[in-house]
Amino acid sequence: MKKISLPKIGIRPVIDGRRMGVRESLEEQTMNMAKATAALITEKIRHACGAQVECVIADTCIAGMAESAACEEKFSSQNVGVTITVTPCWCYGSETIDMDPMRPKAIWGFNGTERPGAVYLAAALAAHSQKGIPAFSIYGHDVQDADDTSIPADVEEKLLRFARAGLAVASMKGKSYLSVGGVSMGIAGSIVDHNFFESWLGMKVQAVDMTELRRRIDQKIYDEAELEMALAWADKNFRYGEDQNASQYKRNEAQNRAVLKESLLMAMCIRDMMQGNKTLADKGLVEESLGYNAIAAGFQGQRHWTDQYPNGDTAEALLNSSFDWNGVREPFVVATENDSLNGVAMLFGHQLTGTAQIFADVRTYWSPEAVERVTGQALSGLAEHGIIHLINSGSAALDGACKQRDSEGKPTMKPHWEISQQEADACLAATEWCPAIHEYFRGGGYSSRFLTEGGVPFTMTRVNIIKGLGPVLQIAEGWSVELPKAMHDQLDARTNSTWPTTWFAPRLTGKGPFTDVYSVMANWGANHGVLTIGHVGADFITLAAMLRIPVCMHNVEEAKIYRPSAWAAHGMDIEGQDYRACQNYGPLYKR
């Protein structure tokens, strides 16, 4: 079966069409703007899979309807999913704009004095607003000379932010969310909303009962040679932690081996269900070999599976990580308990950064007073105002131990194409695999246990659905925190010390939900959240605006907020603008 091609970014150089001197004098400068934009994007951005982003430039500069149509024909044939229009001069507004209502679009008007690029930018944006097709404005802060071919830093920042978010939109369109199972323990996010996926993300939902996973395991619908490789890899790399179960619930060596085997098989089969596996076709299992074209998935697990079979912790942790027995590779997006809305936040984070995501319960707010009462020690540094305990039963990406290193030697989580095998091994070495607690998981399993290194910048996100309003996005930038060992051990033991922990301190603003750490916890909209590496809340805000998902909570600096120009016409309060604009335009793929 032919592999689906990756979306490309189309560059549209537009120009003043008057011949006899005007157009001729602008051709080279205009096309050079397009080439410079393409070169910047190709150099600085990759797809989430690690592939280089391909830019497609119109064959000619665009002066009017005919050349605009020719450009559109070229883009349509080359899977262009995002467009950037560039110009240093006046052009004919509505005659030259990109009219595709579902394709993210931006316009860069060169800030120069010789020709009025700003005037075209304003005229074109007015046309976009009047026609109900929002576009992003890019206009440099400082005037440039006509022969200056450099891209100013502020223009570069907007071009790249737009491109990252636009590619995320284009990459999700046409894919599916694989819902393995149904509603887990009444968790609202696992009440999978097909309309949300279809109307806001352009995705489908593939609902599959957990018996399909059981069938694949029992009937050996998997690569048996790969299973042996996975088992050998686990034998070499897994370090087992304490079994805290009562003696009557402890398993013997043979039983533990069977649990490990099934856990690895679950990872393989969920992966195959998501993306397919041509090895299955070689076994005559052509239908199963195709997969479900899933860019994200969720596994219900609790309780209808986990009361009888090994839990999904090992499978989810390995799939969500940037490495396994096949080496370093792109992480998958698999939501615990089939929390599809947390899965979407994971998907956003992965598409924007190319990194693995940490799925966690937003479990406990620890005030400075409570910590001192319990441990006899005071919180300090980033943690001085209190911390949030992010912990789940073991499905977080192993990258979350932060044993990878950036260019300055600091702990981080890298895009998978930058991760060395040594860094992957370090993450594995920092992880213990603890037998699942019987009271929670009667069918057994292994939970990954690690502690995230401190001082690492993170962005915590969550998508919620509000009846009568639709989806909203929450964002909280902050840092992981390293606690003194004795303090960590005492606090961790009060929850479940066999699970992975991140101590998180959000950046406070003194206002609203970021008045203090307690307010962040109190305003969080659900029991789950996602950690994405870096302070990338601004990218999430831009992506949300493209999809028409309002942001109900964030602590991103106002100067970094980048939304379509038409948002400014929806009032003077920028967050109110966001709500009104999203309501006015409706979901991107509304029918």
From Swiss-Prot:
- Give binding positions for Mn(2+): E337, D361, H528
Main subcellular localisation: cytoplasm
Q: Which GO terms describe its molecular function?
A: arabinose isomerase activity; L-fucose isomerase activity; manganese ion binding
Catalytic site positions: E337, D361
Catalysis performed (reactions): L-fucose = L-fuculose
Involved pathway(s): Carbohydrate degradation; L-fucose degradation; L-lactaldehyde and glycerone phosphate from L-fucose: step 1/3
Sorted alphabetically, the Gene Ontology cellular component annotations on this record are:
cytoplasm
What does the annotation say about its assembly with partners?
Homohexamer.
Similarity comment = Belongs to the L-fucose isomerase family.
What is the official name of this protein in its record?
Answer: L-fucose isomerase
Q: What species is this protein from?
A: Salmonella typhimurium (strain LT2 / SGSC1412 / ATCC 700720)
**Gene transcribed to yield this protein:** fucI
